[in-house]
């Protein structure tokens, strides 16, 4: 019997580390490369440039040459930038009101009429985002998901733009004009009114404009007169054309759903029945009367909901040649979709399956082995796909 005792050392495996304070500070290395492109290019700038940033484009970079005024919606400026050569320049900022009467009667609000005018004797850049405030109290304002797009006009076509917050920024050169559509025009009293909304602004001339839309914004190019597209009226952001008459003639209403519910009023079986005559009705006439009353009430509720509460969905058919801007809608973002149809063949050739099976068998043979030990002590390793053959040999022996 072994009388040796085991002595446990509870602190044998512990390590003690001593921390010595050091007054030296090691500065981390600074990497000047951020891996992103420069947002501003204001050196030797001759023309105004607008660039949408990001995917989705929720911000825009604007570069402005000297002495060119820039108009931006109030609350949409994110940052201002000056380079070394223009750091001594002063950027003047003033408030200006645009189209107050139009916005007041169209949207019952004047917040979309307040713009900030920026001017400088040197070139500068700035970042802009669609930060709209529709209420005096910011906590009560409801901001929908919005993206930005740039519009560069060369004077060949005019643009009609719809929406309360569509125009975010534009350059104030002498060749760019933004005119609100007159809501009350005595000349159009005897003319046929257009089927689209009259709450639009016309942009004409040459220059850059920054637009905002609900959800994502896409451009559709209709190249020929035969090209046409049907758009939900709420999703139409802008449309181009040579004149207002040409734009008006290119848009027509496309009806998919008939107004049978609104137009076809149910006719009662019992006609000219007054409340004073109810006590004279028979039991069967009572049933018919209340059945007619039920159908009439149901029709009135459906008509009220479709016409006043829900609103009838209007589709507009637009003919080319022209460009159309569409927006996907509030709180919706759709990523870019490939234009070409891509088909994926999911079938696997039988030859490749056989090849894979053979490779799998060979791989299994590398790791499935049996060992034979002879009486003389020799050891022999052999690979095998399975042990059936080896078991049969052992049974025979």
UniProtKB/Swiss-Prot annotation:
InterPro entries: AIM24, AIM24_sf, Trp_RNA-bd_attenuator-like_dom. GO terms for cellular component: mitochondrial inner membrane. This is Altered inheritance of mitochondria protein 24, mitochondrial. Belongs to the AIM24 family. GO terms for biological process: inner mitochondrial membrane organization. SUPFAM superfamilies: TRAP-like. The lineage of its organism: Eukaryota, Fungi, Dikarya, Ascomycota, Saccharomycotina. Its main location: mitochondrion. Disulfide bonds: none annotated. It comes from Vanderwaltozyma polyspora (strain ATCC 22028 / DSM 70294 / BCRC 21397 / CBS 2163 / NBRC 10782 / NRRL Y-8283 / UCD 57-17) (Kluyveromyces polysporus). Keywords: Mitochondrion, Transit peptide. It is found in: Mitochondrion. It holds the Pfam family AIM24. The keyword Transit peptide applies. Residues 1-24 form a transit peptide. It comes from the Eukaryota. Transmembrane segments: none annotated.
């Amino acid at each position: 019997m072994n009388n040796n005792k085991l002595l446990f050392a509870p602190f044998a495996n512990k390590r003690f580390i001593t921390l010595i304070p050091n007054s030296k500070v090691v500065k981390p290395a600074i990497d000047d490369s951020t891996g992103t492109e420069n947002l501003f290019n204001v050196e030797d700038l001759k023309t105004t440039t607008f660039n949408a940033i990001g995917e989705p484009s929720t911000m825009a970079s604007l570069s402005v040459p000297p002495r060119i005024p820039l108009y931006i919606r109030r609350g949409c400026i994110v940052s201002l930038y000056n380079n070394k050569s223009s750091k001594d320049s002063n950027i003047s900022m003033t408030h200006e009101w645009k189209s107050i009467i139009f916005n007041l009667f169209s949207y019952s609000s004047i917040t979309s009429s307040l713009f900030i005018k920026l001017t400088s004797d040197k070139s500068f850049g700035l970042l802009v985002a669609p930060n709209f405030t529709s209420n005096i109290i910011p906590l009560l304002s409801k901001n929908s998901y919005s993206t930005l797009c740039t519009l560069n006009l060369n004077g060949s076509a005019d643009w009609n733009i719809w929406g309360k917050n569509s125009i975010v920024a534009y350059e104030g050169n002498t060749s760019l004009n933004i005119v609100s559509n007159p809501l009350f025009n005595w000349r159009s009293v005897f003319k046929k009114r257009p089927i689209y909304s009259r709450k639009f602004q016309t942009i004409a001339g040459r220059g850059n404009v920054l637009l905002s839309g609900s959800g994502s914004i896409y451009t559709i190019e209709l190249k020929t007169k035969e090209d046409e597209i049907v758009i939900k009226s709420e999703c139409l952001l802008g449309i181009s054309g040579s004149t207002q008459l040409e734009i008006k003639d290119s848009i027509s209403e496309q009806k998919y759903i008939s107004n049978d519910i609104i137009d076809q009023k149910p006719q009662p079986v019992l006609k000219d029945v007054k409340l004073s005559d109810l006590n004279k009705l028979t039991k069967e006439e009572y049933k018919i009367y209340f059945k007619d009353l039920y159908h009439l009430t149901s029709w009135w509720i459906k008509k009220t909901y479709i016409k006043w509460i829900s609103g009838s969905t209007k589709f507009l058919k637009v003919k080319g040649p022209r460009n159309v801007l569409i927006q996907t809608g509030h709180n919706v973002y759709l990523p870019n979709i490939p234009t070409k149809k891509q088909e994926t063949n999911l079938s696997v050739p039988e030859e490749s399956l056989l090849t894979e099976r053979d490779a799998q068998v060979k791989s299994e043979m590398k790791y499935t082995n049996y060992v034979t030990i002879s009486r003389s002590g020799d050891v022999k390793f052999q690979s095998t796909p399975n042990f059936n053959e080896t078991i049969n040999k052992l049974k025979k022996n």
